[in-house]
Amino acid sequence: MTKTDVSGLSQLGAKVDLPQSPEEAVLERVPSGHGGTDFVVRFTAPEFTSLCPMTGQPDFAHIVIDYVPDGWLVESKSLKLFLHSFRNHGAFHEDCTIEIAKRLVSLLSPKWLRIGAYWYPRGGIPIDVFWQTGNPPEGVWLPDQGVPTYRGRG
């Protein structure tokens, strides 16, 4: 079993206040320890919250992030705090989704990353936002993101 060096982490195991904005949030990474092996890491945030930049009303999404590491893993507590920092952040659905993906790509330089953000309806229209860095590595198992298309009461 590989022992992961966590000595450089500032949030894991510490009491940390919730960042007031995504810009303040500190994303941290740890070495993957499995170089040469392609595998998929999935994070699911079924209760993601941000604010509408126009009305200040809350927006809710079910977000699924999949990535194939290339040396680095995102430290999950820092990711949780980063995602929670959007709770008081006003931005459109598309902006939130792409900002999350780009911050992770910048931090990790993964072989591949995709994000699916399934936003709950506002004004009667659900908005789903999808983005990925390119084609996934050949041979990796990519399960469906598992979020059904919004049907309302149909």
From Swiss-Prot:
Gene Ontology CC annotations of this record: cytoplasm
GO molecular function: preQ1 synthase activity
Pathway in which this enzyme or protein is active: tRNA modification; tRNA-queuosine biosynthesis
Residues reported in the UniProt entry to bind substrate: V74, E75, S76, H93, E94
Stored Gene3D superfamilies: 3.30.1130.10
Domain of life according to the entry: Bacteria
First-level EC class: oxidoreductase
Entry's localization field: Cytoplasm
Keywords from the UniProt entry: Cytoplasm, NADP, Oxidoreductase, Queuosine biosynthesis
InterPro entries: GTP-CH-I_C/QueF, NADPH_dep_7-cyano-7-deazaG_red, QueF, QueF_type1
Location (main, coarse): cytoplasm
Coiled coil start-end: none
Residue positions of the active site: C52, D59
EC number(s) reported in the record: 1.7.1.13
Pfam families hit by this protein: QueF
One annotated GO biological process: queuosine biosynthetic process
Reaction(s) catalysed by this chain's protein: 7-aminomethyl-7-carbaguanine + 2 NADP(+) = 7-cyano-7-deazaguanine + 2 NADPH + 3 H(+)
Function: Catalyzes the NADPH-dependent reduction of 7-cyano-7-deazaguanine (preQ0) to 7-aminomethyl-7-deazaguanine (preQ1).
PANTHER family the UniProt entry points to: NADPH-DEPENDENT 7-CYANO-7-DEAZAGUANINE REDUCTASE
Family stated for the protein in its record: Belongs to the GTP cyclohydrolase I family. QueF type 1 subfamily.
Protein name (database record): NADPH-dependent 7-cyano-7-deazaguanine reductase
